[in-house]
């Protein structure tokens, strides 16, 4: 009982998948995340959306790309998410 156990508690990161709608800022992309929600009274399925600014260190993601973002520590006043990976590249027409 005199031994101390070294237990690590890992906090699970919150991740979302969305589409890049803007990459005009340096090292930042704006990601649109859409989700489906059932209306509490009428029961209809409605789309809710939110835009998140995410950190893109190498400026490699373009508009239309589908990316996965993860929440982290605040990088700036409005940016606390970072791009984890590219899910699907935008189709060039």
Swiss-Prot record:
The gene is rpsQ. One of its GO terms (biological process) is translation. One of the primary rRNA binding proteins, it binds specifically to the 5'-end of 16S ribosomal RNA. Part of the 30S ribosomal subunit. Transmembrane segments: none annotated. Keywords: Ribonucleoprotein, Ribosomal protein, RNA-binding, rRNA-binding. It comes from the Bacteria. GO terms for molecular function: rRNA binding; structural constituent of ribosome. GO terms for cellular component: cytosolic small ribosomal subunit. Belongs to the universal ribosomal protein uS17 family. The keyword Nucleotidyltransferase does not apply. Pfam families: Ribosomal_S17. InterPro entries: NA-bd_OB-fold, Ribosomal_uS17, Ribosomal_uS17_bact/chlr, Ribosomal_uS17_CS. It comes from Bordetella avium (strain 197N). PANTHER family: 40S RIBOSOMAL PROTEIN S11 FAMILY MEMBER (PTHR10744), SMALL RIBOSOMAL SUBUNIT PROTEIN US17M (PTHR10744:SF1). PROSITE patterns: RIBOSOMAL_S17. HAMAP family: Ribosomal_uS17_B. This is Small ribosomal subunit protein uS17.
């Amino acid at each position: 009982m005199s031994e101390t156990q070294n237990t690590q508690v890992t906090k699970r990161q919150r991740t979302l998948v969305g589409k890049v709608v803007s990459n005009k800022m340096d090292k930042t992309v704006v990601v649109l995340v859409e989700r489906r929600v059932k209306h509490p009274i009428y029961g209809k399925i409605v789309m809710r959306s939110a835009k998140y600014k995410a950190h893109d260190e190498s400026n490699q993601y373009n508009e239309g790309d589908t990316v996965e973002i993860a929440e982290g520590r605040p990088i700036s006043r409005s940016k606390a998410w970072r791009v984890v990976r590219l899910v699907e590249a935008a189709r060039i027409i």
